[in-house]
Every structure is written in C-alpha cells, then in structure tokens.
Amino acid sequence: MTLITRPEGLSLDQIAPSRRSLGVATAGGLFFAAYAPAALSQSAQPIATDAAGLIAQDAAYPAPDGFALPAYVARPEGAGPFPIVIVVSEIFGVHEYIRDVCRRLAKAGYAAIAPAFFVRVQDPAPLSDMQAVQRIVAAAGYDQVMGDIGATLDWIGAQSWAKADKVGITGFCWGGKAVWQAMARFPTLDAGVAWYGRLSPAANATEEQKTAGRPWPIDLTGELKAQVLGLYGGQDGGIPNDTVKAMTDALAAAGRTDSQIILYDDAPHGFHADYRASYREADAKDGWRRLLELFGSRLKS
C-alpha cells in the first residue's frame, strides 16, 4: 500500500490554485504555463534567467531500476570542467522555477543538474490537483530517491565537462529533506544547502507516517559527510521553530560545528519560491548569497 503523507511544510490551503493557474488568459500565459499551477500565485513575478552563454538541455541516464531518468542540465558554454550542483525539486517536480534555479547556478559557473524523481509515476509539474500531486510524491521513497542521486553522480562522472570531484547539492521543501539524507549517504558530496525541508516527523504524525519518512534528518546528524547549510523560515507552519532548534542541538551534539541552520524570523515556508505568494525577496536573496558563498568555498577552491 502506498502511504500518502502531507508534503513537507505545506498544507492545502497554503497552495490553493490561483485564477492564473486555472487558465485565465494573460499576455504572459505561455511563460506562466511552465510553472506548477498547483502553487502559482496570481501576482507572481518570477525571476527569469536567460540561457545566454549557457548550454541548457534535457538529458536521461539509467537509474538502478533500469528506468531512464530524465534531468534538466544547465552549464556554462565551453569545455569546462565545471563544479557540479545537483538540484532537488519541491513536490512539483522539474518545472520552470527549478529550471531557472539551474540556469542561475550555471550563470555562477556551475553545471547544474535537476533529476525528475517523480516521473516514473507521472510528472506532477502540470497538475493543479494537490491530492494527485501528493500521491505521485508519496511513491518516490527513500531508496528510489537515493538511487537516483547515485545514478546522477555516476552520470556526472562520465561527462567531460564535469568536475566530478567537486559536487554540491541543494533542494527545496521535499528536496530540502532529501539534501540532508544525501549528505549523510554520499561521501562524494562536498557541500549541501537544504531549503526548508522537514527535519523530523510532525507532532501529530502516525507511526506509519513516521516510518514512511525515515530516515529523518534529525537522526542523521552524526552521519553527515560534509558541511550542510539549512535555510528555514520562522513562520513555517509545517516546520515549527522547536524542531529547527532540536536539529541545531543535534548538529552540535554530533560535533558538526561546520553545519548550521539560518532561521529567517518572518519568512514562511517556500520563501525562495518566486512564483508563489510565499516568496520573500530579501530572505531569498540572503539565502542565495549564503548558498553561493558555501559552494564557492567548497566547490571552487
């Protein structure tokens, strides 16, 4: 049986579809159609990063189960080799926001790869039905996701433009939790940045939900292979501040003094998602600055 659990940090009323997502025609309709309609804000003015000076393309490579795993890749023009950043999406998959994040990283000198973890079941990106999205996401378990990340690392190692000994990972919401998990599993990862990924089970979680979510980041602090930066919102209704404090304490107890969590006091969940009403420009920019500082020190040195 597939257990359906609420996506990390989100509730259905936080991501109600807007009039734009329901098909209101606008001059920029084709542009906005590339964003996840389940969360697109009517007043969104998302960042649009062009591909000038970049090579941006789709790729596919074999996962451990034989599935041809699709991914979006953006990298600077030229032979490289370039340091790598794996980008792990939110529950909405590889839609335009995630592709734009990849292009932003490529503009900063990285080769960015965003695997499409959910498409074995269905691509959630074009869906406006949140319950359908939840069912798709619930099917992507820990073993599959870690296997897909391992396959991504293998594929990176075979690319002439990739600096395969300098690899970072970042992810948002569902992907933020996966960052903590991956950093505890893969010694080839040199740094991670986790944006508002759930750290531990919700206070009202059932035993089934607790089991389905394992391993939880709070239980992995002693296994982290390299530095992790967590970026969290103080007004995130799905990730209470006391769980962030517990994670900070667990990192200290494990001796991971290089890893830290930044808590933006007034930020909600999804504060980096510029296509959603949750976007907080100042906090998103500060978090991005910190990401670039960490990756610059760990991947470009």
Could you tell me what each predicted segment is?
Residues P81-E90:
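Short beta-strand element of the alpha/beta-hydrolase
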Residues A16-S21, L30-P46:
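N-terminal twin-arginine translocation
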Residues A44-E77:
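N-terminal cap/lid segment of alpha/beta-hydrolase-fold proteins
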Residues A151-P217:
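Primarily recognizes the serine-hydrolase "nucleophile elbow" in alpha/beta-hydrolase
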Residues Q134-A158:
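Alpha/beta-hydrolase active-site loop
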Residues F118-D143, A273-D274:
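Cap/lid segment of the alpha/beta-hydrolase catalytic domain
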Residues M1-P17:
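N-terminal secretory signal peptides
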Residues G230-Y232:
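Short beta-strand/loop motif that positions the catalytic acidic residue
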